[in-house]
């Protein structure tokens, strides 16, 4: 069998996979390229690579595809269509517009994409207007926390999506303390394990460093950055049209119940914070921002687009003409 191509980031991530594949001590992760990157994706890669019959490297990456397809099929559980043909059509269409062979070349974006899609499926059963449902909240937080072990930005997504989930519950501050404590304890646990077992915990870029302080005082430079980021946002939305579907869904959803309205409000706030986070990341980065935007922002945006997919399914569920005629 010919080996599917490893792309640029894949050559960094495979080094982590090789540490696990060769049964090396986990501390050896500090000596590979980009040691500050989280390693769970590399462990999964190595596990399925080592336990495959032929032990081809790309067999480990096949799990990423399996995880992705499985997450897409969670649509079945919430779609209230009378016609199975429509369900299959929707699932097939989602795969067509979200499948990117390039990202299966060793990139970790699909792990974030699939994790958020599965988490959002569980969030649809949360009733924000009742007392906090601890068991459901803890399950969702557990699912979301895995993102921290896939990519650096996973921690910030965990804070955005998990924090909002707790904050918007119709409960007292006292009742929200426990899940908030669990969330921050989970973040601290990841920090502690990486710092004290692997030996390193840091991000790929410095936050609000001296270079950023210099730039922030230059209004014209910041404006040029914002314009460039916005331009590449539009390019990314065209490249991954699921975002276009998400935005139109947010704009045109109507005739929804109180429970659905709360879910929609949660998604809207998450969307705003999600977008602001991306702007903040690229405004903060001191590197050649035009080049950086051209090679990264599409992937950064793609990995969170799945979270808002259920708004589109909600619209289809409400459209009886569509759901009953196919």
PLM regions and their residue ranges:
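Membrane-lumen/periplasm interface segments of specific transmembrane helices
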Residues: 2, 167-170, 175-255, 271-279
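Extracytoplasmic catalytic/substrate-binding loops of multi-pass membrane glycan-assembly enzymes
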Residues: 2-16, 22-44, 55
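Hydrophobic, aromatic-rich transmembrane alpha-helices
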Residues: 68-80, 166, 238-268, 310-312, ...
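Transmembrane-helix signature of polytopic, membrane-embedded enzymes
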Residues: 73-97
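Membrane-interface helix-loop-helix junctions at transmembrane boundaries of multi-pass membrane enzymes
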Residues: 79-87, 129-135, 169-178, 251-272, ...
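Short acidic/glycine- and proline-prone juxtamembrane loop motifs at membrane-interface regions
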Residues: 102-111
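Specific aromatic-rich, kink-prone transmembrane helix
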Residues: 111-129, 143, 307
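Membrane-interface alpha helices of multi-pass inner-membrane proteins
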Residues: 136-152, 158-163, 185
């Amino acid at each position: 069998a010919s080996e599917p191509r490893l792309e640029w980031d894949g050559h960094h991530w495979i080094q982590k996979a090789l540490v696990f594949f060769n049964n090396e001590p986990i501390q050896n992760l500090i000596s590979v390229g980009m040691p500050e990157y989280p390693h769970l994706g590399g462990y999964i890669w190595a596990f399925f690579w080592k336990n495959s019959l032929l032990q081809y490297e790309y067999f480990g990456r096949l799990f990423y595809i399996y995880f992705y397809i499985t997450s897409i099929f969670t649509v079945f559980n919430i779609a209230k269509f009378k016609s199975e043909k429509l369900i299959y059509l929707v699932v097939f269409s989602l795969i067509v517009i979200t499948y990117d062979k390039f990202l299966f070349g060793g990139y970790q974006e699909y792990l974030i994409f699939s994790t958020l899609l599965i988490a959002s499926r569980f969030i649809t059963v949360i009733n924000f207007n009742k007392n906090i449902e601890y068991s459901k909240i803890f399950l969702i937080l557990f699912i979301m926390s895995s993102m921290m072990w896939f990519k650096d930005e996973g921690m910030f997504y965990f804070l955005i999506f998990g924090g909002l989930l707790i904050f918007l519950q119709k409960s007292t501050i006292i009742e929200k303390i426990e899940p908030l404590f669990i969330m921050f304890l989970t973040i601290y646990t990841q920090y502690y394990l990486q710092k004290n077992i692997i030996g390193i915990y840091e991000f790929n870029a410095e936050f609000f460093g001296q270079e950023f302080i210099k730039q922030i005082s230059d209004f014209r430079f910041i404006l040029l950055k914002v314009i460039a980021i916005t331009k590449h946002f539009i390019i990314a939305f065209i490249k991954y049209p699921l975002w276009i579907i998400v935005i139109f869904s947010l704009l045109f959803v109507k005739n929804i119940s109180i429970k659905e309205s709360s879910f929609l409000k949660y998604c809207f706030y998450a969307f705003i914070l999600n977008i602001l986070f991306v702007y903040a990341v690229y405004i903060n980065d001191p590197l050649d921002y035009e080049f950086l935007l051209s090679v990264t922002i599409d992937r950064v945006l793609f990995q969170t687009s799945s979270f808002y997919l259920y708004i589109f399914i909600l619209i289809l569920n409400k459209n009886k003409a569509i759901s009953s005629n196919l």
